[in-house]
Amino acid sequence: MENQPKLNSNKEVIAFLAELFPLCFTAEGEARPLKIGIFQDLVERVQGEENISKTQLRSALRLYTSSWRYLYGIKLGAQRVDLDGHPCGELEGQHVEHARKQLEEAKVRVQLQRAAQQAKKRENGEAASPRRPAAGKRPIKSDNVMPSKPRPKQERPAPAPRQAAAPVAKTVSVTDISMLQIGQAIKVKVGKNPMDATVMEIAKEGVRVQLSSGMALIVRAEHLQF
């Protein structure tokens, strides 16, 4: 392919690979499991293409194999394929389990991000709409009413000295889910801002918690804090 424009994004690289190797890569829909070591095969097959580099190939391949549609295709009994679509061995159980955990963690991250965004929107909405002061009643004018004398100004008491802020309690990461109890208050790590939650169920695959927003989800121990 001569005079091809330079590819600038992972999405463009994946589309390029899907066009070049349609029996291996797909631009949309469920993806097929790839042969182990396929990166080296890619380098050898596209080394004459001036519009793509090894770094771009590696980055695009990493994105492709971590996408939800690829992880959905990692199932027991599925066959890995090479660049030409030839089967290269059945998936092993450990690889299927690893993909399942990756998919679960990706879903949890998305749910937590959505919950954090909703909480932020609520906070911004409350801050942007301050309460209107209640309208006072207008005084009724009358010729027979004597004007009231101005009240003497009262001296305001001196403000009390500010108290030192209470120290922020440090949180501890959960290392063993057997330490948790149903109904226990806990925090779920979402970036730099942990979110309050309550333990609803303790299962083998993780801990089901309910966020303060009402959203329930299953979280792995490494995402929890006391």
Curated annotation (Swiss-Prot):
Residues spanning the signal sequence: none
Record flagged with keyword Cytoplasm: yes
Region described as Disordered: 111-167
Top-level lineage group: Bacteria
Keyword RNA-binding recorded: yes
GO BP annotations, alphabetical order: post-transcriptional regulation of gene expression
GO MF terms, alphabetically ordered: RNA strand annealing activity; RNA strand-exchange activity
GO CC list: cytosol
One Pfam assignment: ProQ_C
Cell location: Cytoplasm
NCBIfam families named in the record: PRK04950.1
Role according to the record: RNA chaperone with significant RNA binding, RNA strand exchange and RNA duplexing activities. May regulate ProP activity through an RNA-based, post-transcriptional mechanism.
Family: Belongs to the ProQ family.
Protein name: RNA chaperone ProQ
Organism: Sodalis glossinidius (strain morsitans)
Gene of this entry: proQ
